[in-house]
Amino acid sequence: MAKGHRSQIKRERNANKDTRPSAKLSYARVSVQKACFVLDAIRGKDVTTALGILTYNPRYASSIIKQLLESAIANAENNNGMSVENLYIEECYANKGPTMKRIRPRAQGRAYRIEKRMSHITLVLNER
């Protein structure tokens, strides 16, 4: 058990918090594999370059990730006071979420299972 006064423990915990601007989308209706195709294309890029890539990328996941990136940019400006010109994508990853199970009727009374996969997508920005 931790020793010390409760307020001191809180202060220490808040001092160790990550202050980089970020945005997280939970339960996105796109599989991790499909989201990672788009995330690999923008990892390490400047924010303006990444927005251009996401705008003209034909994949469905790119529209979701573009909204998430715009949210992370707004967080950086409003919460951290950073300028957009210096921002770049430091981390971006997709973790596996729950799977919705659905049934597809087939011939002669059979049924095939369809798995609609979800993911949790996280973007972390930083200044150069």
Where are these predicted regions, by residue range?
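Ribosome large-subunit tunnel/peptidyl-transferase-proximal elements
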Residues: A2-A94, M118-R128
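Strongly charged
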Residues: G97-R128
